[in-house]
Design a protein with these regions (language model features):
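Extracytoplasmic small-molecule ligand-binding "clamshell" domains
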Residues: 23-99, 245-246, 253-256, 265
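Extended ligand-binding regions for polar small-molecule ligands
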Residues: 24, 61-69, 128-131, 135-149, ...
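Ligand-binding clefts/hinges and TM-proximal coupling segments of bilobed small-molecule sensing domains
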Residues: 24, 149-172, 177, 216, ...
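Bilobed "Venus flytrap"/periplasmic-binding protein-like clamshell domains
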Residues: 36-44, 55-68, 101, 122-181, ...
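Periplasmic-binding protein-like
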Residues: 41, 117-125, 171-172, 205, ...
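Acidic, polar ligand-binding/catalytic clefts
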Residues: 64, 68, 73-136, 219, ...
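Short helix-initiation/N-cap motifs at beta->coil->alpha
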Residues: 76-86, 168-192
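A ligand-binding cleft/hinge motif common to bilobed small-molecule-binding domains
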Residues: 83, 100-108, 152-161, 188-227
Length: 274
């Protein structure tokens, strides 16, 4: 086989390999007339099980609307966070709608279909705490959910991969950081009292407000957000056509006010604006 023939054979093999992935997820979704969404079952009000053991929440409504516009049915799976954000789904899920932050590390293993809302992170203290500012929390015990942007933030390693965001300011030097496997577990410790186990929690404003609404004796510290993060719909890094299709639907949902309505429904205010 001469050099030209070898080169042509190599190009053909590369093209064949690429075509094997072209449209892979989109073709599967359209053939099955259904898509499987990876999300969380214990993160109210984003996604959780109601009294009838049905999945409900903001992320669930967003998923259903995307499926409706694709023209297919939707079902939900609830892998752990590392699986959801780690890619290599091997076709088990078609989409991830779990309030995922686009970081530089995640961009290596998953595709970002589009930003569908923004989440301001806040400092939360017990209602009896004497803390009045972020500076009052220096040297204190801070709780965060593990493997999240709140953990990256408290460790001063936050790298959000999105244009137009202001630089992150680090104003807090904790005495100790305690991590938790679930978003509500830090609040469960904080509700026991100021300093009993924690002095503060860094969490999304929406999650904190939901905890307070449900009777947790907490308050959000005045003085502004810790940081503001974009949240993206994600998919496996195998099908640019599917990524683009879902991204187009997200843009439509922004323009026609659907995302504004859904954030207002679940959070009481519009978190969809850029």
């Amino acid at each position: 086989m001469n050099i030209v023939t070898k080169l042509l054979a190599g190009v053909a093999l590369l093209a064949a390999a690429n075509s094997a992935f072209a449209g892979e997820t989109l073709d599967r979704v359209m053939e099955n007339k259904a898509m499987v969404v990876a999300t969380n079952s214990s993160w109210p009000p984003q996604s959780f099980l109601d009294d009838n053991n049905e999945m409900v929440g903001f992320d669930i409504d967003v998923s259903r609307e995307i499926a409706k516009r694709v023209g297919v049915e939707v079902s939900f799976q609830t892998p752990d966070w590392a699986t959801l954000t780690g890619g290599r789904w091997q076709g088990r899920y078609d989409l991830g709608v779990g309030s995922v932050t686009p970081t530089k590390a995640r961009a290596q293993v998953i595709d970002f279909a589009g930003i569908y809302y923004y989440s301001p992170y806040v400092y939360v203290v017990h209602k009896d705490s004497t803390a009045k500012s972020v500076e009052d929390l220096n040297g204190k015990v801070i709780g965060v959910e593990t493997a999240t942007t709140s953990e990256d933030f408290i460790n001063r390693k936050l790298e959000i991969d999105a244009p137009g965001l202001p630089p992150v300011e680090y104003k807090l030097t904790p005495g100790e950081v305690r991590t938790f496997a679930d978003s509500m577990l830090p609040f469960d410790d904080l509700r026991l009292g100021d300093g009993v186990r924690l002095n503060a929690v860094i969490a999304p404003e929406q999650t904190a407000m939901n905890a307070i609404k449900n009777g947790y004796p907490l308050r959000i510290l005045d003085g502004g957000y810790a940081f503001r993060e974009p949240l993206v719909v994600i998919d496996e890094k195998v099908d640019p056509e599917w990524t683009a299709k879902v991204g187009g639907i997200i843009e439509e949902m922004k323009k026609d006010g659907t995302l504004a309505s859904l954030t207002a429904k679940w959070y009481g205010k519009d978190y969809s604006a850029d």
